[in-house]
Amino acid sequence: MKLKDFAFYAPCVWGTTYFVTTQFLPADKPLLAALIRALPAGIILILGKNLPPVGWLWRLFVLGALNIGVFFVMLFFAAYRLPGGVVALVGSLQPLIVILLSFLLLTQPVLKKQMVAAVAGGIGIVLLISLPKAPLNPAGLVASALATMSMASGLVLTKKWGRPAGMTMLTFTGWQLFCGGLVILPVQMLTEPLPDLVTLTNLAGYLYLAIPGSLLAYFMWFSGLEANSPVIMSLLGFLSPLVALLLGFLFLQQGLSGAQLVGVVFIFSALIIVQDISLFSRRKKVKPLEQSDCVIK
């Protein structure tokens, strides 16, 4: 098996974030967790490497901001103002946004199977979560929508732009994590004080988020994007709430209702369709993400 075949690793690991955050990290420090997920891993990966071409710096910053920096900041802003289920529901719209952007920016045709998978996954998310009866915070809804659009745009632009000639995937991942961390850093410093005490349990949680949850996850994610369309990758995101649900059931004594089990069936149906789309795309020989040979002035 090749790295591209492990694209599912990233959304599965990201599905553990809520469990790790609530069980291992200091309370009410989400931006610090986001910063530690991005900046240290990025520095490790680019340390000692050559600088990218000058014309690529702005592209790497845009990709890092969309895929990581803006996404994390908006996501945590929304999480403080909305129930987690609402954030997940808004996030389930991401595949539909990616389908539209792929059509507009990559001229990829819209397939019926893509739409069916996106709708099936969205229905599954609705069944997994419980929506509140109280009015929703408008600012939280806007932030959640911006987080969803940010990651969707980052996926499509990463596919469109590729990566600089001669740059390895690890280094490409590192630059995005580094640039994303630079976006998060001033927001964290201005809005969130550091914790008074950091325990060994906290350190273990931060280490997990930084290495398996970020460095390895984003490396696998971008490697998968080389061989698959952004639509397929966005549909794999439905794995995250499934993993979160499973961890809650196994370790947090959270029960499973009949509706949630039906939701699991819908999401698995969407993932089966994703596999079918992937096989179809490979037969059609969709051009993979390549290193860019263009000279940018």
Curated annotation (Swiss-Prot):
<feature type="transmembrane region" description="Helical">
    <location>
        <begin position="86"/>
        <end position="106"/>
    </location>
</feature>
<keyword id="KW-0813">Transport</keyword>
<dbReference type="Pfam" id="PF00892">
    <property type="entry name" value="EamA"/>
</dbReference>
<feature type="transmembrane region" description="Helical">
    <location>
        <begin position="60"/>
        <end position="80"/>
    </location>
</feature>
<dbReference type="InterPro" id="IPR004779">
    <property type="entry name" value="CO/AA/NH_transpt"/>
</dbReference>
<feature type="domain" description="EamA 2">
    <location>
        <begin position="149"/>
        <end position="276"/>
    </location>
</feature>
<feature type="transmembrane region" description="Helical">
    <location>
        <begin position="116"/>
        <end position="136"/>
    </location>
</feature>
<feature type="transmembrane region" description="Helical">
    <location>
        <begin position="167"/>
        <end position="187"/>
    </location>
</feature>
<feature type="transmembrane region" description="Helical">
    <location>
        <begin position="138"/>
        <end position="158"/>
    </location>
</feature>
<comment type="similarity">
    <text>Belongs to the EamA transporter family.</text>
</comment>
<feature type="domain" description="EamA 1">
    <location>
        <begin position="12"/>
        <end position="130"/>
    </location>
</feature>
<feature type="transmembrane region" description="Helical">
    <location>
        <begin position="261"/>
        <end position="281"/>
    </location>
</feature>
<keyword id="KW-0472">Membrane</keyword>
<keyword id="KW-0677">Repeat</keyword>
<dbReference type="InterPro" id="IPR000620">
    <property type="entry name" value="EamA_dom"/>
</dbReference>
<keyword id="KW-0812">Transmembrane</keyword>
<keyword id="KW-1003">Cell membrane</keyword>
<feature type="transmembrane region" description="Helical">
    <location>
        <begin position="231"/>
        <end position="251"/>
    </location>
</feature>
<feature type="transmembrane region" description="Helical">
    <location>
        <begin position="6"/>
        <end position="26"/>
    </location>
</feature>
<feature type="transmembrane region" description="Helical">
    <location>
        <begin position="38"/>
        <end position="58"/>
    </location>
</feature>
<comment type="function">
    <text>Involved in pectinase, cellulase, and blue pigment regulation.</text>
</comment>
<protein>
    <recommendedName>
        <fullName>Protein PecM</fullName>
    </recommendedName>
</protein>
<dbReference type="InterPro" id="IPR050638">
    <property type="entry name" value="AA-Vitamin_Transporters"/>
</dbReference>
<dbReference type="GO" id="GO:0005886">
    <property type="term" value="C:plasma membrane"/>
</dbReference>
<keyword id="KW-1133">Transmembrane helix</keyword>
<feature type="transmembrane region" description="Helical">
    <location>
        <begin position="203"/>
        <end position="223"/>
    </location>
</feature>
